[in-house]
């Protein structure tokens, strides 16, 4: 295991590594341990008691964080006709069809964070499944990125909408803000995420749902959150 730097070691002294804190306490501590010279991203990591290999135990969705993430996402939209103008007016960074497919395939171009598509464009987008899928960029109705309401979709993403989904180890990783955010802003974003994940609990999930929860800054250590406190 690589040796951690002096700032990291100092950050460890700010809290008890063996203790699990309530969400609000964890937010206070994660701000204290974010000591890098840049504005670190604060992330939540949530391990769930489900098995993502089973279709009936998937946990996926999207929410608009009350205070955004501190980053304005670049949005690419697949649309045609009048929907192109709608997407552009809503603030989409890139709008197109086959031309964007060619650019992504030919140039290995990925200068965007979220992909949105109208349902009638999914045949075109499907050609990019092998490259968008592994990057978590494939549009999906559950996350609101396959829709004819492009104005709403683009504006919500620009306002701080984030998608959450399980990785192969049944963990959700979601940014909830920046170290420069006020504690109350981070706490509210964190609470909004936890409530959404709680509501998304699959009927097939058995036993303890929230297995472990932590928050961390880009360069800082993870702060454990008491799983029994996340729904309070």
From Swiss-Prot:
* Pfam assignment, any one: Ribosomal_L1
Task: Give the Gene3D superfamilies listed for this entry.
Answer: 3.30.190.20, 3.40.50.790
One GO term (biological process): translation
- Has UniProt tagged this entry with the keyword Cell cycle? no
- An annotated GO cellular component: large ribosomal subunit
The record's section on InterPro entries has:
Ribosom_uL1_bac-type, Ribosomal_uL1, Ribosomal_uL1-like, Ribosomal_uL1/biogenesis, Ribosomal_uL1_3-a/b-sand, Ribosomal_uL1_CS
Give the keywords, sorted: Repressor, Ribonucleoprotein, Ribosomal protein, RNA-binding, rRNA-binding, Translation regulation, tRNA-binding
**Keyword Lipoprotein in record:** no
Coiled coil ranges (UniProt) are none
Q: Name one GO molecular function term.
A: rRNA binding
Subunit composition? Part of the 50S ribosomal subunit.
Q: Into which family does the record put it?
A: Belongs to the universal ribosomal protein uL1 family.
Which PANTHER family does the annotation name? 54S RIBOSOMAL PROTEIN L1, MITOCHONDRIAL (PTHR36427), LARGE RIBOSOMAL SUBUNIT PROTEIN UL1M (PTHR36427:SF3)
HAMAP family hit by this protein: Ribosomal_uL1_B
NCBIfam families for this protein: rplA_bact
- Described function: Binds directly to 23S rRNA. The L1 stalk is quite mobile in the ribosome, and is involved in E site tRNA release. Protein L1 is also a translational repressor protein, it controls the translation of the L11 operon by binding to its mRNA.
State what protein this is by name.
Large ribosomal subunit protein uL1
- Species whose genome carries this gene: Alkaliphilus metalliredigens (strain QYMF)
